Amino acid sequence: MLSIIIPLYNAELHVPSLIKNIKELDFSNIEVILVNDGSCDSTEALVTDFINSFNSVNLKFINKRNGGVSSARNVGLQNINPKSLYLTFFDCDDWFYSEVLNSFLVEIQSLPDPDLVLFNYVRNFGVISERIDHKLNGVFSLSENFVMLYTSGLIQPCWNKVYKTSLIKENHLRFEEGISMGEDFRFNISFLEVSKNVAAFSSSLYQYNSDSANSLTKRFLPDSFEYFKYGISKVNELCHLKGIDYPDIHNRYITALKDRFRNLALSTLSYKEKNILFYEDFSFVRNNLDKIKTGSLSPQDRIIYMFVRLNLPKFIWLAFSFHRLIKFESYK
């Protein structure tokens, strides 16, 4: 059985399309667990009506006090079917491809018992969309392709992955509660620490709606740089544990600085306040320049590196502002 856990919070606008999506699933080998995280709108009423009319033992609806997405997912994990072999986590404002899920348990039988299954996905920007393709197929060890998967942003989210249920149960893995961002990434790193192999399917499992108001690309995140630093340290630990060769991991500090600027642009802070925050992060990168491998930096990042080394934060600010050197790297 494949289990799908979907948290809901004030999701009345998304419930109709979610219901349509769920109806396309084959409930003979799939269960869906909807967790209402203390919604204040009509989410509960809409889902209750659907549950009563659909009448399937493999469609569960759980109400709980508001505690955040991690709390809701953890409640879902506590209520999965004992027969569950694999599970995944979706968001209610996105879209999943039911035909891929319906055939998953059949297709997985042709592979040698993977711990984690990685899919491609589609990123929807409203008017246009982009297919994110890992260009992999089959089973491989984590050390083979981890760096590519991490730097391309495919490791970070949960919704492009299917996890072996037994590994989560045996290792008592849960989402960290009480944090404002990065809960997917932290869970994935913990899962990868106990995983042996990964399978990649060439099909797209999921459509992530970047145009959603809840998308991290639309919100100012005060702790975004700290999250990036934490992520780099955790990846470094994972690489040591798994014997993954990633000598230029600290080059990601440049990426973190670029991302910080892009996120500051979303804030309502004054120009002075933005400069203060940016300079704090700039100073951290400058103090860690000795860890950066300049030979593997892109031409764009070498310019940023040069400004950091010369202690010219205002030049970076101007470069970001007027030449648009950065490309925001989303991690929902």
Regions found by a protein language model. Name each.
Residues 64-82:
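Glycine-rich, basic loop-to-helix element that forms the pyrophosphate-binding segment
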Residues 92-201, 206-225:
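Donor-binding/catalytic cores of nucleotide-activated saccharide
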Residues 267-332:
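Membrane-interface aromatic/basic loop that binds lipid-linked glycans or pyrophosphate carriers
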Residues 14-16, 41-50, 75, 99:
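Acidic helix N-cap motif at the loop->helix transition within catalytic regions
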Residues 205-211, 218-247, 259-289:
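Catalytic core of nucleotide-sugar-dependent glycosyltransferases
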Residues 10-24:
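Short, well-formed alpha-helical segments that are part of the catalytic scaffolds
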Residues 83-95:
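Short beta-strand-to-loop acidic/aromatic patch adjacent to the donor-nucleotide binding site
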Residues 36-46, 66-67:
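A conserved acidic beta->alpha catalytic loop
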